C-alpha cells in the first residue's frame, strides 16, 4: 500500500473489552448505513469530550510512560493495551499529540461520514518541515483543502483509474516474471534444490522496479543481481526516513532542527537522497517529453501522460510523483513478505491457494488479466494479511462536523484515530482473531468496514489498485513456481517504524515445484 500514516503483536487480554463504564458494542445496522437517529442520541444520554476515559490530563507524564514502554517501536501494542484498558473509545494526549481513539467498525462508518468534502489526516510535521526547509512543493500526500482535491482528482483520472490498471497489467507481469526468474537462478547457484534467504531487499528492488516502470515508462534492471549504488541508496533512505519520522510526531521538528539533533540530520539527509534520486528519473523523462523522443509504442509512463494532459504544472506533478515513489517501496514489499511468511507457516492454506491458481491458469490459459479475476482466495490472503499486519496501524481524520461516537459528543476539528491493528485482533470483531484464516472473508462473516488496510473514502491510499495488482500477480507466479517454507520454531512479530515491519529477518525457503 502507498498510504502512510501514524499509529498496533498480540492481545494482552484476549477476553473482554467490557469495563465498568463502557460495554463494547458493535451497533450493527441492517443496511450498514448510519442514520441521524443512530448518530445523535437524546441530550440526556450524551456525554462530553471531558467524560471520555483515557490518560489525557497528564500529557507530559505520558511522554515518560510512552518512552518507558518503548512506544516508538511498539505504538501498535500501546494502542492495543489502551483499548483493553479503557474500552472501545479513549482519549489520549502525549506531548503535543492529542487524539480520540476508536475501534468499532460502526464508529468507523460514522467517522467516514464526518470527514467532509476535504478529508484531513494528521499532518506529517517532519515531512512538511523538510519541504519548507528546501522550499519544495507539497505533493498529494501533504496537500489539504481545494488544492488536495484538485490534485487528487487529476491523479485519480490518470493512472490510478481501474481502466488504467488493466492497461498496466502486462508491465506488472513482465517485472514479476523477471523476479521469479531471479529466484530460479538463485536456486541453481545454491547447488541444492532450494534457496533459503531473507527476501527483504529483493522485494524492495522489485517494488522500485515496478513503480519506476509505471511512473517513467522505463526499466531499471534492478533484478539482475548486480549491486547498483544509486537505487540501493534510495531504498536505504526510504527506510531511514520512515524510522526517523515517529519521534517528530511528538517532539516538534523545529526544536530538533534548532539544536541540529542527529535524528533531524538523518531525516533531512534521507529526504535529500530521495529527492535527488527521484529527480534523476524525473528530469530524464521530462527531457524526453520535451524532445518528443519517447517510443510511441511503449507505455510512456505516468509522468509523460500527466505532462501531456497539462492540468498540473511540472513542479506540482514532480511533488506528487515523489510522494507516490517514496510511498511505494517499503509498504507493498512488507505486506508481500508477511503474506509469504503466513503461507509458509500454514502449508495447508498455501496448498489451497496454489490449487486455485493452477485451476485459474488452466481456465484462462495463463492470461494475467483474466487470472486476476479468478483467484478469490488469494485476494482473501491479501485481506487477511492486512488484518493482522496493517501497513499503517491507524487511520486518522479531523472531523468536519460535530459528531457522536459511543454516546460522546465530539466537536468538529477533533483528531479521531481508528485503530486498525487493534481492530484486526479483537475477538468481538473477528472470530478467533489470532488465527490466520483467509477463508473468513469468503464465508459470510460481516466484513463491512473491516477491510480498511488501504483506508477509506476519497483520501484512501492513492496507489491501492497498483499495490493490490502487484501483490496478487507476484503471489500467483511465486506459488505457481515455488513451495514456500519457513522455520516453524521462529516467530516473527511486528515492530512500529511509522509503518508496521517485522521485528527480525523473515527467512524463507523456496523450493521449485517440479
Swiss-Prot record:
GO terms for molecular function: cholesterol monooxygenase (side-chain-cleaving) activity; heme binding; iron ion binding. Pfam families: p450. It is found in: Mitochondrion inner membrane. GO terms for cellular component: mitochondrial inner membrane. It is an enzyme of class 1 (oxidoreductase). PROSITE patterns: CYTOCHROME_P450 (PS00086). Heme binds at residue 461. It is a peripheral membrane protein. It catalyses: 6 reduced [adrenodoxin] + cholesterol + 3 O2 + 6 H(+) = 4-methylpentanal + pregnenolone + 6 oxidized [adrenodoxin] + 4 H2O. Its main location: mitochondrion. It comes from the Eukaryota. Residues 1-39 form a transit peptide. One of its GO terms (biological process) is C21-steroid hormone biosynthetic process. Keywords: Cholesterol metabolism, Heme, Iron, Lipid metabolism, Membrane, Metal-binding, Mitochondrion, Mitochondrion inner membrane, Monooxygenase, Oxidoreductase, Steroid metabolism, Steroidogenesis, Sterol metabolism, Transit peptide. Its cofactor is heme. The keyword Plastid does not apply. Its EC number is 1.14.15.6. The keyword Cell membrane does not apply. Catalyzes the side-chain cleavage reaction of cholesterol to pregnenolone, the precursor of most steroid hormones. Belongs to the cytochrome P450 family. This is Cholesterol side-chain cleavage enzyme, mitochondrial. It comes from Hypanus americanus (Southern stingray). The gene is CYP11A1.
Amino acid at each position: 500500500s502507498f498510504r502512510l500514516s501514524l499509529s498496533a503483536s498480540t492481545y494482552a487480554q484476549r477476553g473482554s473489552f467490557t469495563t465498568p463504564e463502557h460495554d463494547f458494542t458493535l451497533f450493527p445496522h441492517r443496511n450498514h448505513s448510519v442514520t441521524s437517529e443512530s448518530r445523535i442520541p437524546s441530550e440526556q444520554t450524551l456525554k462530553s469530550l471531558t467524560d471520555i476515559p483515557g490518560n489525557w490530563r497528564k500529557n507530559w507524564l505520558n511522554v515518560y510512560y510512552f518512552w518507558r514502554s518503548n512506544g516508538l517501536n511498539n505504538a501498535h501494542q500501546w494502542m492495543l493495551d489502551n483499548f483493553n484498558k479503557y474500552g472501545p473509545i479513549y482519549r489520549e494526549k502525549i506531548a503535543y499529540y492529542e487524539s480520540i481513539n476508536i475501534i468499532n467498525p460502526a464508529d468507523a462508518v460514522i467517522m467516514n461520514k464526518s470527514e467532509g468534502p476535504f478529508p484531513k489526516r494528521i499532518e506529517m510535521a517532519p515531512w512538511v518541515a523538510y519541504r519548507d526547509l528546501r522550499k519544495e512543493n507539497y505533493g498529494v500526500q501533504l496537500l489539504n483543502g481545494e488544492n488536495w482535491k484538485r490534485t487528487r482528482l487529476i491523479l485519480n483520472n490518470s493512472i490510478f483509474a481501474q481502466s488504467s490498471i488493466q492497461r498496466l497489467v502486462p508491465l506488472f507481469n513482465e517485472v514479476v516474471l523477471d523476479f521469479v526468474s531471479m529466484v530460479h537462478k538463485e536456486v541453481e547457484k545454491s547447488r541444492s534444490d532450494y534457496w533459503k534467504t531473507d527476501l527483504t531487499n529483493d522485494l524492495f528492488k522489485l517494488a522500485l522496479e515496478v513503480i519506476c516502470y509505471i511512473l517513467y515508462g522505463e526499466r531499471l534492471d534492478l533484478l539482475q543481481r548486480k549491486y547498483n549504488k544509486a537505487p540501493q541508496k534510495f531504498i536505504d533512505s526510504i527506510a531511514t526516513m520512515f524510522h526517523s519520522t515517529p519521534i517528530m510526531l511528538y517532539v516538534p521538528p523545529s526544536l530538533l532542527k534548532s539544536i541540529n539533533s542527529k535524528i533531524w540530520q538523518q531525516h533531512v539527509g534521507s529526504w535529500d537522497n530521495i529527492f535527488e534520486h527521484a529527480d534523476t528519473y524525473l528530469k530524464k523523462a521530462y527531457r524526453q517529453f520535451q524532445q518528443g523522443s519517447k517510443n510511441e509504442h511503449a507505455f510512456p509512463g505516468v509522468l509523460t501522460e500527466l505532462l501531456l494532459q497539462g492540468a498540473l504544472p511540472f513542479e506540482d506533478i514532480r511533488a506528487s510523483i515523489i510522494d507516490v515513489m517514496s510511498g511505494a517501496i517499503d509498504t507493498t514489499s512488507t505486506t508481500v513478505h508477511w503474506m509469504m511468511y503466513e503461507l509458509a507457516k500454514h502449508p495447508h492454506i498455501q496448498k489451497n491457494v496454489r490449487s486455485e491458481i493452477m485451476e485459474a491458469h488452466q481456465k484462462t490459459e495463463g492470461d494475467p488479466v483474466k487470472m486476476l479475476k479468478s483467484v478469490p482466495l488469494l485476494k482473501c490472503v491479501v485481506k487477511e494479511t492486512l488484518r493482522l499486519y496493517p501497513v499503517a496501524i491507524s487511520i486518522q481524520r479531523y472531523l468536519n462536523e460535530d459528531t457522536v461516537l459511543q454516546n460522546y459528543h465530539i466537536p468538529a476539528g477533533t483528531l479521531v484515530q481508528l485503530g486498525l491493528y487493534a481492530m484486526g485482533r479483537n475477538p468481538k470483531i473477528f472470530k478467533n482473531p489470532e488465527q490466520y484464516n483467509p477463508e473468513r472473508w469468503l464465508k459470510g462473516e460481516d466484513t463491512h468496514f473491516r477491510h480498511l488496510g488501504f483506508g477509506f473514502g476519497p483520501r484512501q491510499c492513492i496507489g491501492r489498485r497498483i499495490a493490490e495488482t502487484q501483490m496478487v500477480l507476484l503471489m500467483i507466479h511465486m506459488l505457481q513456481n515455488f513451495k514456500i517454507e519457513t522455520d516453524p520454531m521462529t516467530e516473527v512479530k511486528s515492530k512500529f517504524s511509522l509503518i508496521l515491519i517485522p521485528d527480525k529477518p523473515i527467512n524463507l525457503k523456496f523450493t521449485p515445484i517440479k
